[in-house]
């Protein structure tokens, strides 16, 4: 890891009780095929969708379901996540295998 995990906690404004969980969430399968972030990513995608949906529901109480769905899709997608990851310099914290380049997280 190029930078330490405590500096990442400061950037995102969250102090983890279990830093091993944070470390796992930052571990790409190329670094550790058995203990990596894939299952946490699955769970995180659902949590992110729920949190954003709840906020959209509160912010736009008169919008129809289809309009809320379009807003959700514009906020929760790979392109937006890549933008946020790059803004946070996530590539400085992700653990990848020797054959994987994490110099920039790209929208692929």
Regions found by a protein language model. Give the residues of each.
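RNase III-family endoribonuclease catalytic core
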Residues: 1-108
């Amino acid at each position: 890891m190029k930078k330490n995990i405590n500096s990442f906690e400061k950037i995102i404004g969250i102090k983890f009780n279990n830093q091993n969980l944070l470390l796992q969430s930052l571990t790409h399968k190329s670094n550790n095929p058995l203990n990596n972030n894939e299952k946490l990513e699955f769970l995180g995608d659902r949590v992110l969708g729920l949190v954003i949906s709840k906020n959209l529901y509160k912010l736009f109480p008169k919008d129809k379901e289809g309009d809320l769905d379009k807003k959700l899709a514009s906020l929760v997608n790979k392109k937006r996540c890549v933008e946020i990851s790059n803004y946070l310099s996530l590539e400085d914290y992700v653990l990848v295998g020797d054959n994987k380049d994490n110099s920039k997280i790209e929208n692929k």
